[in-house]
Amino acid sequence: NKNTFLVSIDMPAGTVLENTDRVARAIGDYIRRIPEVKDYETFVGTGSVMDFNGLLRGGAFREASHFADIRVNLIDKEERSLSSEKIVLAIRPDIVKLAKEYGANIKLVEDPPGPPVRATVVAEIYGPDYAKQRELAGDIRALFAKTAEVVDIDDSVKEKQDKYQLVVDKEKAALMGISTEQIVQTLRLSVAGMAISTLHRPDARNPVAIMLRLSKADRTGLADMDK
């Protein structure tokens, strides 16, 4: 019966920070209505404050835009009738349903009574053929999903990343008087940004770079390149 638990949110790899934040806010809005909750803190794009349990579970590697954690603090156990375990069990169905609406995978993690472990049940697959490992991992995950009392199923299989290559139509660009270099620089400026000048502030020792680039809302996907 602890005074805290963690909600771990995993979105598909490549999800922009704003979409991950949207899921975290929705779950946070639900959590704030729970009478036994004292307060909570949300970490988007990074893991929660590291503890021994998080160290063993790989919390140090949750540095990406598709990760979020919500650390929930409960009122003292002397002031509530429900244990932290019963609270987590009661809210789990609603949080899982809410997460699925956004395509998120969530885990509700309580501090273990004994030494921390990666998970209650862990299946490890070894072999020289990674494709076969991925296939077996999917089969085992499906088996876990059918097993009673097994929740928060996850795996370490890396999602495939799409790679796009933009090819410049040099003939059309030449007819419009635009060089390939100009097109590349414009794309780079739009997505990655570019320092176009510096700002000299009287209260700062070093000059501050002025960056020019599109807002995050205008560079979330390949379709934005057509604008």
Predicted features by range, described:
Residues 2-17:
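Short extracytoplasmic/periplasmic juxtamembrane "stem" segments immediately C-terminal to an N-terminal membrane anchor
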Residues 6, 19-39, 51-162, 174-227:
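Surface-exposed amphipathic alpha-helical segments in non-transmembrane regions
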